[in-house]
C-alpha cells in the first residue's frame, strides 16, 4: 500500500520487493565481511582511518626511533621500519592443525595476561610484536597486555609515546586491559617479568619477547593443553626470523630445549616414536627460548623467576628445572607458532661487576648459573664447577633457606630424578666421561686457541679457557668443538676432528696413569718442558712437568 492508502499494482510491488532484497543482500555482505574480521583487524582498519591525525599515525611514531646503527639492535632496523605494522606470514604449522577444532574452556576460565618486557627495543619491532598479537588472538581470551620498559636509555619517551598512540587508536573500542610500566633504572628481564606477572589478573600468563611475530591460530592450541593440566607450562614452536633479512622461516619440530653441564641452553634432537606425529605436543626438558605460558597461580607458587638472578640469563633453565622437579611438566606445542628473532649476540650491556678478570656479561652468567647449580643440581653441581671453575670465586649474597623450604613443602624430586626421567641426554653425557673440565699443569691450563691447531698452556682464568672431556670408552680427549688432542707425524701435538673409525682414533687415544697422560700409540707422555709449550717425551713417574689434573675426575686413575 502506497502513501495514498491504495494497494500498489503488481509491477510496482515487484519493483519494491526487488529493491528491498538488493538492499538486504548489500547489508548482508557488509555484515559478513565485518564478522569475518577479528576485533583486532577492525582495530587495524581504524588505524588506517586515523592516519590523517599525526599522533595516531604509526609512521610518525616509528620516525621518533633514535638514530643508531644496526649493530646496536642486532637486526636490520631499516628493513623493520619499512615493513610496517603487520605482514602476512607463511603457514608453518602442519596442515592438520588448521582443520582441527581446539576444545577450549569458557573465556572467563582461560583468559590470558601477556607480559612483554623490553630494553632499548626499536619502535617498529616492538609495535609489530604488539599488533601481531592483537590481530591474531581471539579477543575473548586475550585479557590484558602488560608492557614493562626496563629503563631504556636510548629512547626514554618510547613508553609514553606508545601509551598515547595506543590510547588514541583503541579509545573505548577494545576491552583489552592495558598496563604501562617503566623501571626508573635497569632492573633486567627477570625482575621486569616478575613485576608484570605480579600485577597480572588473568588465569594464565604468557611471557613474550619484544621481537616476535605471532602467527595465525597460535593461542588456541596452548589453551587446549593447559586446560588438561594445571601444572603444565607450554611453549609454542618458535619459527626463526632472520635478523638481517627478517625472513620468516619454519621451525623444526624435531628439536626440543635442553642445556649442558655449563648450564648453557642447547637445542636437542628428538626421535619420533611410532605413535607420534609431527603436529603432536611433546615434552621438553627446558623451554625453547624465553616464550612460555602457564597458570599464573602455579607460576607464583613456584616462586616466579628466581629473584636473585641478575639482569638476564639462566631464568628459563632455572624455571624449567623447578617445574619438572616440583610436580610440573613442559610441552612444546607445534600447532602454535610464534616467530622470534634470535640475535647473534646481546643487544644490550650488562652492568659492571666486581671481578676484573671477567667481562660483565660473563660474570652475570656465572653468578646466575652458580645460583642454579647451588639451588638444584645437588651433588651434580661439581660438574658445573669443573667446567666453570671461575664460578667458585663469584660471591652469592643470600642463603637458600626459602628455596629449601619450598622444595620440602612441594616434595620436589632430587636432580638425579631429572637426569633419569626428563633429560637422559644429560645423564648419558655424564656417563660417557671419565674426566672433564680444565686440564691443569701447575698454574697453567691446556688451551686450544680458536685459529690454531696446536694447543698451548695459558692462564686458567681466561674467560674462554678450554674445557676438555675425556671419553671413557675411546680414550679421546675432546673440546666442545669436537676437536681431539692427537699426536701426528714427528710426535707433533695437534688438534684434529674427533675420529669415528679405529684408524683415526689410535692417534687420539690417551690413557690416565696417575696424573700422567700417556699416548697409547706412541707410549710417550704429555709434557711441559717450557712455560707455554707442550710436547711428547718419555714418561717419568715423578716429573711435575708431566702432571696434568682435570677439574673433575669421574673415576679412579690408573
Swiss-Prot record:
Q: Which residues lie within the region annotated Catalytic subdomain A?
A: 109-225
Binding residues annotated for Mn(2+), in chain numbering: 209, 211, 340
Cellular component GO terms, alphabetically?
Answer: Golgi apparatus; Golgi membrane
Which Cys pairs does UniProt list as disulfide-bonded?
A: 97-335, 326-412, 445-460, 484-498, 525-539
Ranges per topology, Cytoplasmic: 1-12
The protein's required cofactor(s) are namely: Mn(2+)
Instruction: Please give the name of this protein.
Output: Putative polypeptide N-acetylgalactosaminyltransferase 13
Gene name linked to the record? pgant13
Amino acid at each position: 500500500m502506497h502513501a495514498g492508502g491504495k494497494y500498489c499494482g503488481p509491477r510496482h510491488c515487484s519493483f519494491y520487493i526487488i529493491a528491498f532484497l538488493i538492499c538486504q543482500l548489500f547489508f548482508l555482505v557488509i555484515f559478513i565481511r565485518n564478522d569475518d574480521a577479528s576485533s583486532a583487524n577492525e582495530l587495524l582498519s581504524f588505524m588506517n582511518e586515523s592516519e590523517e591525525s599525526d599522533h595516531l599515525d604509526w609512521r610518525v611514531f616509528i620516525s621518533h626511533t633514535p638514530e643508531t646503527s644496526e649493530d646496536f639492535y642486532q637486526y636490520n632496523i631499516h628493513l623493520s621500519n619499512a615493513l610496517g605494522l603487520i605482514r602476512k606470514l607463511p603457514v608453518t604449522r602442519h596442515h592438520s592443525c588448521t582443520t582441527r577444532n581446539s576444545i577450549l574452556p569458557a573465556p572467563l576460565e582461560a583468559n590470558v595476561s601477556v607480559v612483554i618486557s623490553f630494553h632499548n627495543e626499536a619502535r617498529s619491532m616492538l609495535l609489530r610484536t604488539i599488533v601481531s598479537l592483537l590481530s591474531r588472538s581471539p579477543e575473548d581470551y586475550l585479557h590484558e597486555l602488560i608492557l614493562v620498559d626496563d629503563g631504556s636509555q636510548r629512547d626514554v619517551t618510547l613508553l609514553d609515546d606508545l601509551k598515547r598512540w595506543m590510547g588514541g587508536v583503541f579509545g573505548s573500542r577494545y576491552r583489552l586491559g592495558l598496563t604501562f610500566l617503566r623501571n626508573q633504572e635497569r632492573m633486567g628481564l627477570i625482575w621486569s617479568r616478575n613485576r608484570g606477572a605480579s600485577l597480572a589478573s588473568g588465569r594464565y600468563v604468557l611471557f613474550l619477547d619484544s621481537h616476535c611475530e605471532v602467527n595465525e591460530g597460535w593461542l588456541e592450541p596452548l589453551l587446549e593443553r593447559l586446560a588438561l593440566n594445571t601444572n603444565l607450562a607450554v611453549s609454542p614452536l618458535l619459527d626463526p626470523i632472520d635478523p638481517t633479512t627478517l625472513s620468516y622461516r619454519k621451525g623444526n619440530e624435531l628439536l626440543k630445549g635442553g642445556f649442558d653441564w655449563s648450564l648453557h641452553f642447547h637445542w636437542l634432537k628428538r626421535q619420533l616414536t611410532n605413535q607420534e606425529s609431527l603436529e603432536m605436543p611433546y615434552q621438553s626438558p627446558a623451554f625453547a627460548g624465553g616464550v612460555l605460558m602457564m597458570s599464573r597461580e602455579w607460576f607464583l607458587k613456584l616462586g616466579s623467576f628466581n629473584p636473585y638472578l641478575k639482569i638476564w640469563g639462566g631464568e628459563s633453565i632455572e624455571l624449567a628445572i623447578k617445574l619438572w622437579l616440583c610436580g610440573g611438566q613442559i610441552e612444546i606445542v607445534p600447532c602454535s607458532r610464534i616467530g622470534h628473532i634470535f640475535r647473534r649476540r646481546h643487544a644490550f650491556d650488562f652492568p659492571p661487576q666486581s671481578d676484573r678478570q671477567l667481562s660483565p656479561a660473563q660474570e652475570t652468567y656465572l653468578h646466575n648459573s652458580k645460583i642454579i647449580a647451588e639451588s638444584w643440581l645437588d651433588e651434580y653441581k661439581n660438574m658445573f664447577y669443573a667446567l666453570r671453575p671461575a664460578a667458585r670465586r663469584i660471591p652469592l649474597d643470600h642463603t637458600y633457606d626459602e628455596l629449601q623450604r619450598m622444595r620440602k613443602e612441594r616434595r620436589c624430586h632430587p636432580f638425579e630424578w631429572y637426569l633419569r626421567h626428563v633429560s637422559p641426554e644429560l645423564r648419558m653425557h655424564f656417563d660417557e666421561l671419565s674426566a672433564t673440565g680444565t686440564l691443569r699443569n701447575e698454574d697453567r691450563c691446556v688451551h686450544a686457541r680458536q685459529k690454531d691447531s696446536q694447543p698451548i698452556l695459558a692462564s686458567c682464568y681466561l674467560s674462554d679457557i678450554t674445557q676438555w672431556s675425556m671419553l671413557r670408552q675411546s680414550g679421546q680427549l675432546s673440546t666442545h668443538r669436537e676437536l681431539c688432542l692427537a699426536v701426528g707425524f714427528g710426535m707433533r701435538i695437534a688438534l684434529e676432528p674427533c675420529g669415528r673409525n679405529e684408524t683415526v682414533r689410535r692417534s687420539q687415544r690417551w690413557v690416565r696413569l696417575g696424573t700422567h697422560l700417556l699416548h697409547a700409540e706412541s707410549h710417550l707422555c704429555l709434557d711441559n718442558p717450557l712455560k707455554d709449550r707442550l710436547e711428547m717425551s718419555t714418561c717419568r713417574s715423578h716429573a711435575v712437568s708431566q702432571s696434568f689434573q682435570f677439574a673433575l675426575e669421574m673415576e679412579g686413575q690408573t
